[in-house]
């Protein structure tokens, strides 16, 4: 695990802190924001209710098959700790539709974003009995967003709103923290961007990646090697901005007084799985291909070959179910201050 020492007047940590004094003892609530990497079924509610979310105080039913092909990582955290999960993540979401908006034809509307939908839903729920037991001491807030902001339908193809860029997306992360902090949140985990260049979506066809597919229907018309390199640049650059941005805003700008923030390095975790698959996946290990194969319309899907637990990727974009379980396991280590993938900051 990484521990950070900064100017004493701003007081960070000398040793990696735990978000709770004893692992999981006071971990009663997990509140999550994000996209399909975190969504436990919320988009399905919007799809069946004319693009509207649930009424205040109501959490939609959890799905047992998510974008991982099984449970999603917050559900594994919920099961292993007994914590109550309030998952506001919506598949397809960006951080803010005012920066990057993405059309969802099946809803005849844009995908909801964190700023325009998830945070307002969270604020509305806070006024209901749903949040009666939630305190700053017993609740962890987790944010994982960027996959769609940086995507082919976003910044990668220059499809963002005019005048916005990667730094606008990064600023949105801090705005999300502002809203949660104003609502009483003090324990934060931010998950950085996945190694998207390794996904079938962005890996060149010549290197085992997908051709034209449901997420990028005309991929083969582009210079795929160039776009894979751009995605590597975008993910690593944004992750560096996150690494430097958290201590700057927390300690120098005094933006979230009294808070603890852990940066969870998902990118490195996925790279470790990619480079050492035998430690994580069932044989025969497959870190290049993916399990679910559909046509460009997302239909006529075939699965395999082999078992899902042999795969790093479920489809062209999403980590598989077994990877979701590893993300959850390491998340608990991050929360407990025991993870080599965690960098920890505290404002006293």
UniProtKB/Swiss-Prot annotation:
Keywords: Glycoprotein, Hydrolase, Secreted, Signal. It comes from the Eukaryota. N-glycosylated. Optimum temperature is 50 degrees Celsius. GO terms for molecular function: acetylesterase activity. Its EC number is 3.1.1.6. Residues 1-16 form the signal peptide. Induction: Expression is induced by sophorose, cellulose, oat spelt xylan, lactose, and arabinose. GO terms for cellular component: extracellular region. It catalyses: an acetyl ester + H2O = an aliphatic alcohol + acetate + H(+). It is found in: Secreted. CDD domains: fatty_acyltransferase_like (cd01846). Acetylesterase that acts as an exo-deacetylase. Shows activity towards naphtyl acetate, triacetin, as well as towards glucose- and xylose acetates. Liberates acetic acid from xylo-oligomers. This is Acetylesterase. It comes from Hypocrea jecorina (Trichoderma reesei).
């Amino acid at each position: 695990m990484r521990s950070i020492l900064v100017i004493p007047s701003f007081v960070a940590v000398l040793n990696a802190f735990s978000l709770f004094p004893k692992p999981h003892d006071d971990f009663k609530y997990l509140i999550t924001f994000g996209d399909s990497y975190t969504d436990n079924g919320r988009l399905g509610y919007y799809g069946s209710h004319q693009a509207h979310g649930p009424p205040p105080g109501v959490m939609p039913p959890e799905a047992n098959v998510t974008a991982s092909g099984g449970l999603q990582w917050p559900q594994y955290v919920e099961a292993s700790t007994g914590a109550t999960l309030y998952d506001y993540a919506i598949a397809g979401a960006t951080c803010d539709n005012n920066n990057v908006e993405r059309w969802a034809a099946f809803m005849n509307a844009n995908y909801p974003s964190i700023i325009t939908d998830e945070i307002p839903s969270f604020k509305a729920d806070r006024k209901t009995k749903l949040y009666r037991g939630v305190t700053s001491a017993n609740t962890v807030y987790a944010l994982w967003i960027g996959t769609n902001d940086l995507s082919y339908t976003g910044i990668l193809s220059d499809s963002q709103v005019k005048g916005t860029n990667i730094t606008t997306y990064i600023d949105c992360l801090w705005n999300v923290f502002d809203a949660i902090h104003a609502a009483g949140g003090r324990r934060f985990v931010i998950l950085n961007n996945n190694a998207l260049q390794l996904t079938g979506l962005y890996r060149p066809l010549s290197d085992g990646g997908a051709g034209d597919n449901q997420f990028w229907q005309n991929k083969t018309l582009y210079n795929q090697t160039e776009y894979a390199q751009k995605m590597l640049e975008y993910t690593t650059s944004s992750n560096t901005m996150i690494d430097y941005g958290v201590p700057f805003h927390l300690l120098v700008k005094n933006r979230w007084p009294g808070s603890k923030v852990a940066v969870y390095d998902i990118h490195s975790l996925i790279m470790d799985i990619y480079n050492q698959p035998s430690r994580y996946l069932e044989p025969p290990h497959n870190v290049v291909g993916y399990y679910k194969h559909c046509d460009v319309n997302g239909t006529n899907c075939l699965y395999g070959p082999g078992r899902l637990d042999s795969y790093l990727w479920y489809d062209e974009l999403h980590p598989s179910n077994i990877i979701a379980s590893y993300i959850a396991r390491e998340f608990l280590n991050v929360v407990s201050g025991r993870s080599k993938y965690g960098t920890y900051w505290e404002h006293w």
